């Protein structure tokens, strides 16, 4: 790991502080420790080919190869894959690599669109017309910035039709053929309350005890899972077998779930929701993914609701205050019945300091979302510093508004 994360350092028998994109050093360390099973967490190392390096070294790995991980690392590859295989849930899109083609694509799709650099941007490169970009000139200016600066590592943009509905996440364990879905989760990308402000990697998330969401029906959940299975099958047909955790982000529309994106890994923060509820042995699940032997009975979850809220540095989403000490009373948080997960922080001489990314995730578990949310809020009182939290996540008023909005969409013009 790059940062000295106190949670990981405390849990692991050994760890190496290294750039996680350095495939050679990570593989050498894994071999020196006789590692018997590997899981690659972040998307950057997947793009760098870390899974491939581990597999080549003879280490079973429950994460996709560089080729299969393109469903996340290349938005153009993902969209074209869905189009080639006629996967349900695909949307209208255009792929462009210069300003003239971008303007032509805008003329074709109209201004109700989303602008995405094709490569990895940590969830912060997506711009929605009407929210982040107000005019055609704004879109062209942002496009020129992407092309000239190679934002996301490539001078290419995917222009997508803007979807109307509620976003949701379904994650699944995959072994190349079988898809074992987890409870649905809803993340909140915007930095500020009321879903305002810049996009972030995710400020918090929640799940219900029935594995659904307040606005999501069982048939709609099943339809989204079917899409994920079709994507796994499509990758296999193109000799890019997918073994590992898959993250599907969907927009629930009046016509059912539509694909926003796929991640070749767990979602962050959504992993904290589902793994906090997992009753089964996670290491056994990973073994079975790596060995192509996963089945539905391998993953059993508590029938509980969960809420996660992220503590982030002041300025996160625009210009984070890095290097600031935050005080975390772990014992008091445990007494409140909450779980604590350190994220992108550095520990030095027993003190915890912020980086430019998210700092600490706090999770509450209960029979109902509102009770889990209250647990998190009590625990948050025991974390202090120059920090920011979205306190509105999973509040009853917010959830009621989402249900009402989805009902209006379903009942609207067909």
Please place each PLM-identified region on the residue numbering.
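ATP-binding N-terminal substructure of ATP-dependent carboxylate-amine bond-forming enzymes
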Residues: 1-66
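Short acidic-hydrophobic, aromatic-tinged amphipathic segments that line or gate anion-handling sites
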Residues: 14-26, 92-98, 129, 134
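Active-site "cap" helix and flanking loop/linker of ATP-utilizing ligase/carboxylase catalytic domains
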Residues: 223-247, 263-337, 347-348
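Generic C-terminus detector
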Residues: 346-349, 353-414
């Amino acid at each position: 790991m790059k940062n000295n994360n106190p949670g990981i350092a405390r849990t692991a028998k050994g760890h190496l502080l290294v750039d996680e994109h350095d495939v050679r050093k990570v593989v050498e360390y894994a071999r020196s420790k006789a590692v018997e099973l590997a899981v690659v967490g972040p998307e950057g190392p997947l793009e760098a080919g870390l899974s491939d390096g581990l597999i080549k070294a003879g280490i079973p790995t429950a994460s996709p190869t560089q080729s299969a991980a393109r469903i996340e690392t290349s938005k153009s590859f993902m969209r074209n894959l869905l189009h080639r295989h006629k996967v349900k849930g695909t949307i209208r899109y255009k792929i462009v690599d210069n300003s003239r083609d971008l303007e032509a694509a805008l003329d074709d799709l109209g201004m109700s669109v989303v602008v995405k650099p094709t490569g990895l941007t940590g969830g912060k490169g997506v711009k929605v017309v009407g929210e982040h970009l107000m005019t055609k000139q704004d879109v062209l200016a942002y496009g020129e910035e992407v092309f000239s600066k190679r934002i996301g590592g490539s001078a290419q943009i995917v222009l997508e039709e803007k979807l109307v509905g509620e976003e949701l996440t379904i994650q699944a364990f995959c072994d190349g053929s079988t898809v074992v879905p987890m409870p649905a989760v809803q993340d909140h990308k915007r930095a500020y309350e009321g879903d305002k402000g810049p996009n972030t990697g995710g400020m918090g998330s929640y799940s219900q005890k029935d594995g659904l969401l307040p606005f999501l029906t069982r048939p709609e959940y099943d339809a989204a899972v079917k899409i994920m299975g079709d994507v796994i099958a499509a990758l296999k047909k193109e000799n890019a077998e997918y073994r590992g955790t898959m993250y599907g982000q969907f927009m629930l529309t009046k016509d059912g779930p539509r694909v926003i994106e796929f991640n070749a890994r767990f979602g962050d923060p959504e992993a904290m929701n589902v793994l906090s509820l997992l009753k089964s042995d996670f290491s056994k699940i990973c073994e079975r993914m790596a060995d192509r032997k996963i089945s539905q009975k391998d993953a059993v979850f508590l029938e509980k609701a969960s809420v996660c809220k992220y503590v982030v540095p002041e300025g996160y989403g625009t210009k984070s205050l890095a290097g600031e000490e935050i005080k975390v009373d772990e014992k008091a948080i445990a007494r409140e019945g909450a779980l604590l997960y350190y994220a992108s922080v550095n520990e030095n001489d027993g003190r915890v300091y912020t980086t430019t990314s998210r700092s600490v995730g706090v999770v509450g578990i209960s029979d109902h979302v509102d009770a889990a949310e209250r647990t998190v809020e009590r625990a948050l009182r025991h974390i202090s510093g120059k920090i920011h939290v979205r306190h509105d996540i999973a509040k009853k008023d917010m959830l009621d508004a989402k249900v009402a909005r989805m009902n209006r969409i379903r009942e609207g013009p067909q």
